[in-house]
């Protein structure tokens, strides 16, 4: 089974053995809705939204651990939706399937492929192995709405940019 964007989510669930009723229940769940809305679950807010308390009146922080050639200025937000909660939902949803197939999507209940877009090389990426959650996350990361994801040093966005109907994969 193949899919792009939302089709990657549905296709991956089917490939993992979910029934249509199971999929509907999952997609209507509050956890899943919270994931794509960008709202951080209350129990995680402390870890992601709170600053570490310090005795300083104010502070300025610099980090030189990355060389200047890798410097990427962040003047504008890269997405409308904060991806933290979505990433947590996807880890919970896809971790067992990734572990059981050992990263080979041919070993899922139904062999699976999804399409993502290589931002810099302007071509489709056929995701056939690796972390299933990352592959699906890349395939459904609609530009400006969701932050792109880096997989194997490739920045990946929504697969619908180059192949919205992947019947040729």
Predicted segments, located by residue:
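Patatin-like phospholipase
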Residues: 1-4, 13-169
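Acidic, glycine-enriched active-site microenvironments
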Residues: 10
């Amino acid at each position: 089974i193949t899919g792009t964007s939302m089709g990657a989510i549905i296709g991956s669930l089917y490939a993992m053995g979910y029934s249509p009723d199971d999929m509907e229940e999952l997609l209507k769940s509050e956890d899943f809705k919270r994931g794509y809305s960008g709202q951080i679950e209350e129990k995680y807010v402390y870890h992601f939204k709170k600053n570490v308390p310090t005795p300083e009146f104010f502070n300025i922080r610099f980090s030189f651990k990355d060389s200047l050639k890798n410097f990427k200025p962040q003047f504008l937000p890269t997405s409308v939706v904060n991806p933290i909660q979505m990433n947590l939902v996807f880890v919970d949803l896809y971790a067992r399937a990734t572990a059981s197939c050992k990263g080979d999507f041919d070993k899922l209940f139904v062999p699976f492929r999804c399409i993502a877009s290589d931002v810099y090389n302007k071509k489709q990426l056929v995701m056939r192995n690796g972390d299933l959650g990352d592959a699906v996350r890349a395939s459904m990361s609609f530009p400006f709405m969701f932050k792109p994801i880096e997989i194997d040093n490739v920045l990946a966005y929504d697969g619908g940019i180059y192949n919205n109907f992947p019947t040729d994969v």
